[in-house]
Amino acid sequence: MSLFPSLPLLLLSMVAASYSETVTCEDAQKTCPAVIACSSPGINGFPGKDGRDGTKGEKGEPGQGLRGLQGPPGKLGPPGNPGPSGSPGPKGQKGDPGKSPDGDSSLAASERKALQTEMARIKKWLTFSLGKQVGNKFFLTNGEIMTFEKVKALCVKFQASVATPRNAAENGAIRNLIKEEAFLGITDEKTEGQFVDLTGNRLTYTNWNEGEPNNAGSDEDCVLLLKNGQWNDVPCSTSHLAVCEFPI
């Protein structure tokens, strides 16, 4: 049997195999549907080389790292404003009455009584030697002669006021106390002719001498108690006996 008659057929098979690698199955069917049939897909090749780095992406959110150690305490800050007062608490229960030794109580009462007795004796001595008492007033003089302003200062120093009779009994007590003319706590310095006491109250009792007050020297703003018990207006700058009154 000769090989030559099959040679054309072998060449045709090689050409068909080579052509099938360069065309798709669909194209081959279109060109030669009756001669060549499509073969199965070939084996995958090796992976290609890595491509170039892409563009830099946007910054991501910070990740949750490990919690660090607790730091040292900071400096003490300034004190805050005081808060509002709290509501009052409930009322407590009534306590038991206190007890004091009977000896201390009786001793205090005894000392108080002795002191009161001594004060009463001193008051009598003062009344007998230097002063006069009428009702709840005690009139006292130190025998000094001075201006009206100094008399006021002297009486205030001893928590008293310049003697101011409110009735005939007080006026007579002051008259019996003095041996010479004395200032009274009465003036018309603010309003001429309107005599008031040192607190600004108008007088409810007067005992002016005949023809007084007359403001003879145009500056007679103070009042004297004369030896006869009557009153006379005089300048406050003159000097006369100081008499103070003490409430008791």
UniProtKB/Swiss-Prot annotation:
GO terms for biological process: antiviral innate immune response; cell surface pattern recognition receptor signaling pathway; complement activation, classical pathway; complement activation, lectin pathway; defense response to Gram-positive bacterium; negative regulation of viral process; positive regulation of opsonization; positive regulation of phagocytosis. The keyword Coiled coil applies. Residues 112-130 form a coiled coil. Keywords: Calcium, Coiled coil, Collagen, Complement activation lectin pathway, Complement pathway, Disulfide bond, Hydroxylation, Immunity, Innate immunity, Lectin, Mannose-binding, Repeat, Secreted, Signal. Hydroxylation on proline residues within the sequence motif, GXPG, is most likely to be 4-hydroxy as this fits the requirement for 4-hydroxylation in vertebrates. It is found in: Secreted. InterPro entries: C-type_lectin-like (IPR001304), C-type_lectin-like/link_sf (IPR016186), C-type_lectin_CS (IPR018378), Ca-dependent_lectin (IPR051077), Collagen (IPR008160), Collectin_CTLD (IPR033990), CTDL_fold (IPR016187). Pfam families: Collagen, Lectin_C. GO terms for cellular component: collagen trimer; extracellular space; multivesicular body; serine-type endopeptidase complex. Gene3D superfamilies: Mannose-Binding Protein A, subunit A. Residues 49-61, 93-102 have a biased composition (Basic and acidic residues). Residues 134-245 form the C-type lectin domain. Disulfide bonds join C155-C244, C222-C236. Residues 75-87 have a biased composition (Pro residues). Calcium-dependent lectin involved in innate immune defense. Binds mannose, fucose and N-acetylglucosamine on different microorganisms and activates the lectin complement pathway. Binds to late apoptotic cells, as well as to apoptotic blebs and to necrotic cells, but not to early apoptotic cells, facilitating their uptake by macrophages. This is Mannose-binding protein C.
